[in-house]
């Protein structure tokens, strides 16, 4: 990333009127979790070329990452006022609406994508994550199926596989191991590309199939030996998940050290969800260190603009409840469980992690 940044800075110096290096450097800073620098670069890109829809979307997305929601809306409104529009902008507008709890605006973005190849599937998959966030797994699976079908119709099997493996990871986190395993197999059969393999490995590690996860890690290390984000973020995260599967919390914590500087960044993949912090929290739970675990899970609540609408964002409430229960703070534990149950008040009743949570909460009374 540092070398990339130097390249773009040299480009900027040699071609001061070119907006492209500012766009690229801004994206680079987002991956590095240097959001204020990303804002400055993207604003400069817009000054040099004010009719680039991607720059408005990038600026708004960066403000979302920073939880600066009013600034994000202003960036999106500026784009629309200039009659600039595309699927990436609508994706970011959707995420803003989610964080504001604006169901009508979320529906508007999904409706905008209807019938637009390449946009429709993206917005349907995003909606699937929102349904899962609220525990509506039957609806989530339906939206994921529709997203995959739309991507296949648009002749993009790799994208369809991405939505499939995203759904599989969701199932893994909720305790639906069989569905997760089926989803991983289907995604890899459809299109075993780099990003799909990364999330497949993570999902497999999360459901207790560390050997298969490690095999995929080996393939990724062999095929992408110089990929910075794989080496520093994703492979350590998958390795930590595999260590947790075997109960080796010390190794998991060590594995996650590499990801630490980048865990608040966007991780250059179609998911992020602050996984290193989530897994580190689970490692501390295994280590019987409730207070340290709670601090890690709290990161997901403090950085909702990064976690967005993935299930780890809502499960963080449950994990905080578990952490405080372990630490002996029953009042805080109960409050965290209640936060989780409030968000999942209309959840499908058969979700394994929900059943576990209810049983745990009953013992707190």
Which residue stretches match the model-derived regions?
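Helix-start (N-cap) detector for alpha-helical repeat units in TPR-like alpha-solenoids
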Residues: 19-20, 35, 53-54, 86-88, ...
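Alpha-helical repeat scaffolds
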Residues: 3-10, 39-43, 69-80, 102-116, ...
């Amino acid at each position: 990333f540092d070398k990339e940044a130097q390249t773009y800075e040299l480009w900027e110096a040699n071609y001061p009127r070119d907006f492209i290096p500012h766009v690229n450097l801004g994206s680079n800073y987002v991956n590095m979790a240097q959001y204020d620098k990303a804002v400055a670069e993207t604003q400069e890109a817009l000054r040099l070329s004010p009719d680039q829809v991607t720059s408005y979307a990038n600026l708004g997305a960066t403000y979302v990452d920073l939880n600066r929601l009013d600034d994000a809306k202003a960036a999106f409104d500026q784009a629309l006022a200039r009659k600039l529009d595309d699927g990436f902008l609508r994706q970011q507008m959707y995420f803003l609406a989610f964080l504001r709890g604006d169901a009508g605006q979320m529906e508007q973005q999904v409706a905008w994508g209807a019938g637009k190849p390449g946009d429709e599937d993206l917005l349907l998959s995003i909606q699937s994550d929102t349904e899962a966030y609220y525990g509506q797994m039957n609806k989530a699976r339906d939206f994921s199926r529709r997203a995959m079908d739309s991507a296949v119709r648009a002749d993009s099997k790799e994208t369809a596989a991405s939505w499939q493996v995203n759904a599989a990871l969701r199932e893994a986190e909720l305790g639906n191991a069989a569905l997760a395993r089926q989803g991983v197999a289907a995604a890899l059969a459809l299109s075993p590309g780099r990003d799909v393999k990364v999330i497949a490995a993570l999902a497999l590690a999360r459901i207790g199939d560390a050997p298969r996860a490690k095999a995929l890690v080996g393939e990724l290390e062999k095929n992408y030996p110089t990929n910075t984000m794989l080496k520093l973020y994703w492979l350590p995260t998958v390795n930590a998940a595999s260590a947790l599967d075997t109960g080796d919390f010390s190794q998991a914590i060590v594995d996650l050290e590499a990801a630490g500087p980048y865990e608040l960044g966007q991780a250059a993949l179609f998911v992020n969800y602050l996984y290193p912090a989530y897994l580190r929290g689970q490692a501390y739970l295994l280590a019987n260190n409730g207070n340290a675990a709670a601090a890690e899970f709290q990161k997901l609540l403090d950085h909702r603009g990064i976690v967005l609408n993935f299930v780890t964002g809502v499960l963080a409430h449950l994990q905080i409840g578990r952490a405080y229960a372990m630490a002996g703070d029953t009042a805080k534990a109960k409050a965290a469980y209640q936060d989780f149950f409030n968000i999942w008040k209309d959840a499908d009743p058969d979700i394994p992690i929900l059943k576990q949570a209810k049983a745990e909460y009953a013992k707190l009374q």
